[in-house]
């Protein structure tokens, strides 16, 4: 199944890709933002940007199993998971990223990131988290034994909200627009 959230909706759609059909939905508070699946815990995690929380969805009954606070990360947008270390990374629009234990929901730490973050991406090979903020900064974090630490920021074109990581090459791909033109650029990780 594929779990799909729609901005400002009040449910997460569960889609059967073989039938290309919504088979059920999970009721949630308004304004979902990012959804990720953890294959180790077999849970779906959904940020709720109108509240500082991450919803935990059990895909068996397709119901909310828990609600975890993301405070101090307010307006959580970007969300990523490291299944190997059982860590969930939730990035708030207010410039805070909180690390949660993906089994218990316990907060493991917080780190400052650029304000206005939208999407984040995790590279499992080098254990880095990349946080795209539209004002021209990409925050780079390193997962550590304790939680995460900041490695600094990389300048990006204004409006860079979208990114993806190639876990084979460790390149970070960003997308942005200038006027009516759209661009994609590759950033090489060091």
Protein language model annotation of sequence segments:
Residues 1-190:
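Predominantly soluble domains enriched in secretory-pathway, periplasmic, or organellar proteins
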